[in-house]
Each structure stands twice: as C-alpha cells, then as structure tokens.
C-alpha cells in the first residue's frame, strides 16, 4: 500500500519490523507449548521433535520458553551483526534481522535491490530464511549429534527438497544464489526475492509456498510433514491393492515415529480446508474484478501469510484499490 517507504517516519518502519519479530516469537511460544505438552493431545505432537521431556509443570514450561527467547534473541543479534558487517547500514540491518528471524517479508526500503548488493549478503539472507523454516529445536540440538541425526529427519528432508527445487530451475537464466534465495524464501513463506517479475516460474514458486516448512517453525502453508503423510498413505493404499500381503511400513521420514489414524485424518482435514478456503477467497476476489489469475495467486499468498513479490508476477497489483 505504501509507496516511497524512505519517506516514512523511521520509528514507524521500526515498529512494523519489531511487531513482526514479537509476533514470530509468540507464535513459536504457542507452537512449543502445544507440541511439547502431551496433555493437550494435539494430533501431530508425535511427528516432530518437540523437546526431550513433557513440559507438564510450570517450571519446565518457563525454562523452555526462556530458552526459546534466549536463542531467538541471540539469533537476531547474530543476523544483525552479519548484515552490518556485510555493508548494510545499521537501520536496514536492524529491520532486516527482525524480519528474517521471524520468517517475514517486510522491507525497510522500496526494493530489496537497494539493500542487497553482493553475494555475501545473499548468503546471509539464505541462511536466515533457512533457519526460520526448519524446526526451531534444531538450534537447541545443534551440538548434540545423536539427537540431531535421530530426531531431525524432517529438517533433512526440507533441505534436500530445497536442493531439488533449486536444481529443477538451475538452467534458467538466473544467478545461482538468486534461485536458492527464491526457493528458500518460498518454503519459508517470506516472499523475499531478487528475481524479476518477467519470469515464467510464478506458479512454480506458488506451489513451493503452499508446502511451507517444519511443523515447529514460523512458516505457514500446509507443511511438508502433512504432504509426506498424504503421499505415503496414498502410495500404501495403492500397494495394498496391488499386493495385499505386503508388509506396510507407516513410519515417517524413516524414523521410529509411526503415522496414526488421527495423523491421517487431521492431515486430510487441513489439506481439504486449505483448498476450500482458497476456492472461497478466490471467488470473492474475482467478484472484485482483479482477474482470476491475480485472485488465485493473491489467495495463496494470503492463506500462507506470504508477502507479495516480483517472483509471483504480481508487481502491478494496486492494493489501495482492493
């Protein structure tokens, strides 16, 4: 909606990025409390690493949240320092660090090209967005090799998936780091990109955006774990039809965790709810005369909480007229 952001009051820009930072922190608080406390009986708690023990007591919950706050703050300061060292002015570095650690797409400038100008800065962006899309507990267990290998298969699959998505468009006429940044940004539901709007990959990036990141992360989307469950159960049903005597393996990501009937039901429910919401929202926007393609893209970006950017070919939409 705003044009010429540089003319806005700096305190307003700082408030916008800091509110995003706080929102990301409280969203992590909510996820970790729900996932780590088995008494809530949330249907997906057994599919993603959510701490070593059940946080039933107030003391354990408090300790867990303090650890999250500490790591979240240290990570923000670390990204701020890297951005500042790379040559980005302090004000932009501060706003960008709060945006990146929360997996957002807010910019303190009209264009990301005015902030990011070299490969080192691009690598920092990729690293920051990668961290925001992975399981936040990965940072807890970074130096615990046994837990890292055993409990974070979901994160490994996300990294492998990112590499595959990058390889699929490697031969397009784009710089390598720009491709990686756009793919990771889409998975992290951020929307930050250095790819211009005259690309033919907008639908490709939208599909990646729908997938999202880890269950315990600041990302939106349907989530990779739920897609994995749907694909695996579908393939198992086909195998059962072909070979009824086959031994069915219902483990997820080749771990010790097994997919339960409740996991399957909730995954299908979320999948159907997402596309039903997409249909309803697209229909409402089409009535507003913005065209089917734009309404479809805007609906996906809205449902996945992703910032509109040039890689989705939506640069010419005027939000003030909606």
Predicted regions, residues:
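Membrane-proximal intracellular helices of multi-pass ion channels
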Residues: 1-322
């Amino acid at each position: 909606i705003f044009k010429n952001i540089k003319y806005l009051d700096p305190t307003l820009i700082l408030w916008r990025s800091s509110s995003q930072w706080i929102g990301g922190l409280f969203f992590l608080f909510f996820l970790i409390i729900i996932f780590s406390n088995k008494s809530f009986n949330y249907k997906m708690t057994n599919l993603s690493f959510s701490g070593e023990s059940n946080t039933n007591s107030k003391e354990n919950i408090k300790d867990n949240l303090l650890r999250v706050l500490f790591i979240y703050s240290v990570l923000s300061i670390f990204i701020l320092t890297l951005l500042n060292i790379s040559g980005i002015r302090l004000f932009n570095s501060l706003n960008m660090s709060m945006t990146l650690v929360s997996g957002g797409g807010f910019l303190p400038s009209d264009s990301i090209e005015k902030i990011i100008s070299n490969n080192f800065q691009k690598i920092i962006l990729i690293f920051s967005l990668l961290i925001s899309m992975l399981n936040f507990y990965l940072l807890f267990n970074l130096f615990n090799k046994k837990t890292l290998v055993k409990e974070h298969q979901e994160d490994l699959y996300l990294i492998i998936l990112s590499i595959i998505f990058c390889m699929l468009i490697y031969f397009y006429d784009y710089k390598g780091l720009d491709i990686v940044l756009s793919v990771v940004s889409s998975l992290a539901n951020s929307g930050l990109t250095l790819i211009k709007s005259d690309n033919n990959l907008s639908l490709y990036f939208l599909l990646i955006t729908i997938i999202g990141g880890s269950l315990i992360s600041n990302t939106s989307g349907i989530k990779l774990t739920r897609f994995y469950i749907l694909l695996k159960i579908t393939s198992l049903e086909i195998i059962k039809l072909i070979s009824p005597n086959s031994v069915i393996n219902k483990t997820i990501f080749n771990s010790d965790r097994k997919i339960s009937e409740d996991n399957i039901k909730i995954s299908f429910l979320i999948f159907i709810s997402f596309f039903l919401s997409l249909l309803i929202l697209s229909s409402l926007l089409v009535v507003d005369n913005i065209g089917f393609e734009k309404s479809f893209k805007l609906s996906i970006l809205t449902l996945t909480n992703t910032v509109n950017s040039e890689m989705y070919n939506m640069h010419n939409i005027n939000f003030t007229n909606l």
